[in-house]
Amino acid sequence: MKIAVVGTGYVGLVTGTCFAETGNTVICVDINEEKVKKLQNGIIPIYEPGLEVLFERNIKQERLKFTTNLQEGIKDAKIIFLALPTPPGEDGSADLQYILKVASDLGHLLENYTVIVDKSTVPVGTAELVHNNIKKHAKVDFDVVSNPEFLREGVAVEDFMKPDRVVIGTSSEKAKKVMEQLYNPFIRQGNPLIFMTERSAEMTKYAANAFLATKITFMNEIANLCEKVGANVDDIRRGIGTDTRIGKRFLFAGIGYGGSCFPKDVQALAKTSKDHKYDFQILDAVMQVNHQQKTRLIEPLKAFFNGDLKGKQIAMWGLAFKPYTDDIREAPALENIQVLLEMGAKVRVYDPEAMENVKQIFGEKIEYADSPYGALLNSDVLMIITEWPVFRTPDFEVAGKLLKNKVIFDGRNLYEPSDMTELGFVYHSIGR
């Protein structure tokens, strides 16, 4: 099948590459000439495990191509995916200008019946707006379908190739058959294609992310209370996670969520609620608690230094919002670095993938180590912000000698408190 993907960001690139892997001919379109040139030369602008192998294979076999020309990219395409950014406005609403502009352009360019698919995360009712923008100019039949992505950064290729489910919003039987044909290779193990209306599909995406953000936030609140009452949040997690009604995932306490999805989508759903005069109180609480949780380690850090961090050297392990990605959007590390700098501290950081992205924000205001141990050298204390595997079993004897004080502030609960005490460390974690 001939497929066009408009937008070569995270979602667009994974979508295009994975569809090419199942034998489709895919052309990805982007207005960024420099980005397209790099992609044509085999350079991927994001870090995502497993993507590079598929990308190189499908470029070599000429199933995956890139262009800046929309007309060229969509020619003879049976399906056109819109994987465009929907950045939040100041009021939390999703900015649809890119999607609606492309929709208008498509109206002028469509030559045959085509299925237009919203892959971006968009507010309820967007499929209708896209349909109307295309219809103003189109001379052929078309359908607009909502097909939200449920990719997790770090395991996006696996999520795409072996989905838990595929949600498709359409009221057209013709479009339904096209989408069934497209996704058939991905659901051979029995995971469902779930058909619903376009509005329900758009709402499903927001509901899923808001629920997961709420689950994370609830456990962080439990962790904070555990510290007050002398309980251990790890015990609580095991105690409730074995209840099949609750499940084991997204129960790890820490210093909050970040990334390109949860913060933006919770905010957008809250804005949708306000627009419809519904007071979605849980979402407001989730956003407030998560904002506070990101800098949860600052208070015990200040207490250790008697309130004065001026001139103190802080080592920081982890910058990306989660492991296995270089994405720093809404990452807790950013807020912690900013607060530490404002308090007069010096910061030296290490992350396996995200340091170049952080350098674009902080430049020379902080130091960048070439290894985890390099960050520790002559630092007063260590803060752990992201749970990269490389941080899970360090040589604590070496770490203790490099640090001025054997003190760790762990925002991801990587180590057992009793083990750290035995090793002679002062160890602060979350909810334990």
Cite the ranges covered by each PLM segment:
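Structural/interface elements that position substrates and couple domains in central-metabolism enzymes
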Residues: 1-432
